[in-house]
C-alpha cells in the first residue's frame, strides 16, 4: 500500500519511529541488499500511463522472518513516505526471500522526486535498520519515448522501439505470473514459448519491458494476448 504523508502525518511518523527505536532489547534486523528500478507503466487495460518504483530488500532477522513488520521508503526533504507491511509487501518464493513492492508511486503518476531516500526495515519489537538509495531525476517524456510498440502476428510476437533490449513478462491465460524471458532480438516465436512452457498452450498474456540503457530505468507495456 502506498502512502503520501502530509506534513503533520510525516512529523507524527518520525516521532513514533524515534520513540520505538530503542524500545526493544531484541536483535535488530538487517538489510543485506537493496534493489530498485524506475519504470514507466503503459497499462493497456486501464488506458493510463504512470511511473512506478520497484523496491525490494533482502532482509535478515536473527529472530526469524516472521519477526519483520514494516518496510518504509522515506524522502526526508520532500516529507514523503511509503509504508509496506507484512500483509501488503510482495515476497519471493526463495528460501531467503526478498520483500518489497513493484507499485510505489505518486497519486498523479509522475516520477518520484530525485534525491536520497531512506529504506527502513522494522521488526515487531520496534528495532530497525536502514540504508539509503538515490533516485535519479527522471524526465517523463524521455521514459514515454521508451514505450515499446508490440504486435502479435499469427504465432509471432514482434517488438520495436527505442529500448536497447527487451524482456517478455509472461503470464498464463488466467493472469497468473510465470516468468521473465529475455528477447534476443525483436521477434519471439510463440511456438518456442509453448515448447519451454507447455502450460501456456491454452493461451498467454504478456507485457514487454524495454530497457533504456541507463541503469534501473525502463518502460513496460501490456498486457497483450495470444490465443490458439
Where do the protein language model's features map onto the residues?
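Edge beta-strands of extracellular beta-sandwich domains
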Residues: 128-136, 214-228
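Proline/serine/threonine-rich low-complexity linkers at boundaries of modular beta-sandwich domains
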Residues: 24-36, 129-139
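Solvent-exposed loop/turn segments flanking beta-strands in beta-repeat/beta-sandwich domains
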Residues: 62-71, 160-174
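Sec-dependent bacterial lipoprotein signal peptides
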Residues: 1-24
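Contiguous beta-strand segments within globular domains
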Residues: 41-59, 149-163
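Aromatic sugar-binding surface patches on proteins
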Residues: 89-106, 184-195
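Short, aromatic- and glycine-rich surface loops/edge beta-strands on solvent-exposed regions
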Residues: 111-125, 199-215
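Low-complexity, Pro/Ser/Thr- and charge-rich linker/hinge segments at domain boundaries
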Residues: 135-156, 225-228
Amino acid at each position: 500500500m502506498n502512502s503520501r504523508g502530509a506534513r503533520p502525518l510525516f512529523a507524527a511518523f518520525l516521532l513514533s519511529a524515534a520513540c520505538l527505536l530503542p524500545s526493544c532489547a531484541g536483535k535488530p534486523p538487517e538489510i543485506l541488499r537493496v534493489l530498485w528500478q524506475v519504470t514507466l507503466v503503459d497499462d493497456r487495460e486501464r488506458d493510463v500511463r504512470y511511473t512506478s518504483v520497484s523496491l525490494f530488500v533482502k532482509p535478515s532477522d536473527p529472530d526469524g522472518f516472521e519477526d519483520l513488520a514494516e518496510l518504509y521508503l522515506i524522502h526526508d526533504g520532500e516529507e514523503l513516505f511509503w509504508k509496506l507491511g507484512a500483509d501488503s509487501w510482495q515476497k519471493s518464493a526463495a528460501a531467503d526471500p526478498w520483500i518489497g513492492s513493484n507499485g510505489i508511486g505518486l497519486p498523479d503518476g509522475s516520477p518520484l522526486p530525485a534525491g536520497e531516500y531512506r529504506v527502513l526495515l522494522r521488526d515487531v519489537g520496534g528495532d530497525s535498520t536502514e540504508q539509503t538509495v538515490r533516485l535519479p531525476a527522471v524526465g517523463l517524456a524521455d521514459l514515454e519515448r521508451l514505450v515499446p510498440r508490440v504486435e502479435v502476428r499469427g504465432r509471432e510476437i514482434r517488438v520495436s522501439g527505442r529500448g536497447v533490449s527487451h524482456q517478455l513478462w509472461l503470464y498464463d491465460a488466467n493472469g497468473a505470473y510465470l516468468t521473465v524471458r529475455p528477447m534476443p532480438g525483436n521477434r519471439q516465436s510463440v511456438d518456442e514459448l509453448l515448447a519451454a512452457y507447455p502450460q501456456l498452450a491454452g493461451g498467454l498474456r504478456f507485457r514487454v519491458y524495454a530497457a533504456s540503457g541507463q541503469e534501473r530505468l525502463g518502460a513496460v507495456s501490456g498486457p497483450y494476448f495470444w490465443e490458439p
